[in-house]
């Protein structure tokens, strides 16, 4: 596992230079000595510029909104919460058959992008994100691309904490033998893999606030920001 933040603020070329420069790959030193990495800078590129990908990077990332939400919603893959696989809104909603996330009911069915989706053949109580109004579906055509402000920004810890808290009520109505923390963290090892360590999961379970969790990152984040300076090709706006 390389010491890279979920949102590292680097282009692929810059990141490639950093991986080689810091010798993060599990290869012998002579291979690094012989490595010939060439990164060609893009003329007039601006780090703050917005652009749409010409080709969807995944069948489950069909538009700009899903890509912007991915840094947060990907963590739900380690939980019992659906992020829309098997619906018309992959990575554009959070929902569950028995825990209320919104009044909108969204069916989950297998499709080519999700042959075995979580909570298949059920109706999700879902919160569907959109640029116009996060509380409803209007204007959130899954084929639409836009540069409007995303309903949540970056890695939104509050969204994870809110979802976790909703399961406390769910735990009260299921049988005592099933009532455990794992009603939410159903794939704890995978959640920890996505986060890099088990620290984030334990912080959420311990009731830490978003501010407290973010503060715990600052020391290592500062080290990364300082280290990456040597590999940046474009003006740093962070």
Regions found by a protein language model. Give the residues of each.
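Conserved, well-structured core segments that form the ligand-binding/active-site neighborhood
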Residues: 1-40
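Electropositive phosphate-/nucleotide-binding environments in soluble metabolic enzymes
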Residues: 9, 13, 194, 218
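Surface-exposed patches in mature extracellular/periplasmic domains of secreted proteins
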Residues: 30-32, 213, 234-235
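Glycine-rich, aromatic-lined ligand/substrate-binding cores of catalytic
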Residues: 32-38, 42-122
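Conserved functional hotspot residues or short segments at active or partner-binding sites
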Residues: 89-217
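Flexible, low-complexity junctional segments that flank or bridge functional domains
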Residues: 218, 222-232, 236
């Amino acid at each position: 596992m390389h010491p890279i933040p979920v949102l590292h603020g680097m282009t692929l070329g810059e990141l490639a230079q950093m991986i080689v420069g810091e010798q993060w790959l599990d290869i012998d030193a002579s291979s690094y000595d012989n490595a010939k990495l060439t990164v060609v800078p893009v003329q007039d590129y601006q780090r703050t510029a917005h652009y749409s990908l010409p080709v969807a990077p995944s069948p489950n990332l069909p538009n700009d909104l899903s890509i912007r939400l991915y840094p947060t919603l990907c963590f739900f893959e380690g939980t019992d919460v659906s992020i829309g696989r098997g619906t018309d809104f992959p990575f554009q909603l959070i929902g569950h058959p028995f825990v209320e996330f919104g009044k909108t009911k969204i069916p989950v069915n297998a499709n080519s992008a999700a042959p075995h989706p979580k909570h298949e053949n059920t109706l999700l109580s879902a919160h569907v994100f959109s640029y116009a109004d996060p509380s409803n579906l209007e204007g959130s055509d899954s084929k639409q691309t836009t540069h409007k402000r995303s309903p949540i920004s970056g890695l939104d810890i509050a969204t994870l904490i809110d979802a976790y808290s909703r399961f406390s009520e769910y735990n009260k109505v299921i049988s005592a033998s099933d009532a455990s923390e794992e009603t939410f963290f159903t794939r704890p090892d995978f959640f920890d893999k996505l986060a890099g360590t088990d620290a984030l999961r334990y912080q959420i379970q311990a009731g830490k606030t978003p501010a407290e969790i973010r503060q715990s990152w600052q020391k290592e984040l500062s080290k990364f920001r300082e280290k990456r300076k040597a590999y940046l090709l474009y003006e740093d706006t962070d």
